[in-house]
Amino acid sequence: MFSSSAKIVKPNGEKPDEFESGISQALLELEMNSDLKAQLRELNITAAKEIEVGGGRKAIIIFVPVPQLKSFQKIQVRLVRELEKKFSGKHVVFIAQRRILPKPTRKSRTKNKQKRPRSRTLTAVHDAILEDLVFPSEIVGKRIRVKLDGSRLIKVHLDKAQQNNVEHKVETFSGVYKKLTGKDVNFEFPEFQL
C-alpha cells in the first residue's frame, strides 16, 4: 500500500506535517475507491492548511502545483464534494502554489539578470489566487473602493449563473483571501442591465 505522503510533494524535500498527511491520505483513499482514479493518479499537492474563517468555522486550503491546476479544476467540483464529506463539512478550496518575486530595486537589480515575469508580480498572483478561489464560478467584474482612511475594499462580482453553487461559500472565500493576502474582499452576484 502507498504511504500517506504519496500524494504530497513538498518543496525542498520538507516533511509534510500531520494535517497535510491527513489530506494526502484522504486523496489516496479517493484515488483507490472512486471513479476519479484515472485523473487523480497523476496529481499531487504541495501543501495544505486549515484556517478559521469567522463564525467558528474552518476551511481547508489545498495548494497544488501550477502546471496541475487545470487538471485539478476538471475534477474539482466532485473532489471538493468528496473531501467535504470526509472532513465533516469544512469548506475545501484549491489554490495553485505561486511565487511572488520581490520588486527589483536599485540594490537588488544586479543580482537577478532576468526580468521579473508579470505572472510573478504581487498583483498578478493575488488576482490569480482570487480566480482559483471562486472556481467553478467566474469573476465578471471588480470594483475597488478606497475609503477616506486609505483602506481598500475589493468588491468582486461573480457570475450570477453559479450563484446557487457558491453563494454559501462566499464568507469562506473572503476569510481565505484575507488570510492569504491581507486584503478585504466582498463577493456579490450583480444583476446585469444592458
From Swiss-Prot:
GO terms for cellular component: centrosome; cytoplasm; cytosol; cytosolic ribosome; cytosolic small ribosomal subunit; endoplasmic reticulum; focal adhesion; membrane. One of its GO terms (molecular function) is RNA binding. InterPro entries: Ribosomal_eS7, Ribosomal_eS7_CS. Its main location: cytoplasm. The modification N-acetylmethionine is found at M1. Pfam families: Ribosomal_S7e. Component of the small ribosomal subunit. The ribosome is a large ribonucleoprotein complex responsible for the synthesis of proteins in the cell. Required for rRNA maturation. Part of the small subunit (SSU) processome, first precursor of the small eukaryotic ribosomal subunit. Component of the small ribosomal subunit. Part of the small subunit (SSU) processome, composed of more than 70 proteins and the RNA chaperone small nucleolar RNA (snoRNA) U3. Binds IPO9 with high affinity. Interacts with NEK6. Interacts with DESI2. Interacts with IPO5, IPO7 and KPNB1; these interactions may be involved in RPS7 nuclear import for the assembly of ribosomal subunits. This is Small ribosomal subunit protein eS7.
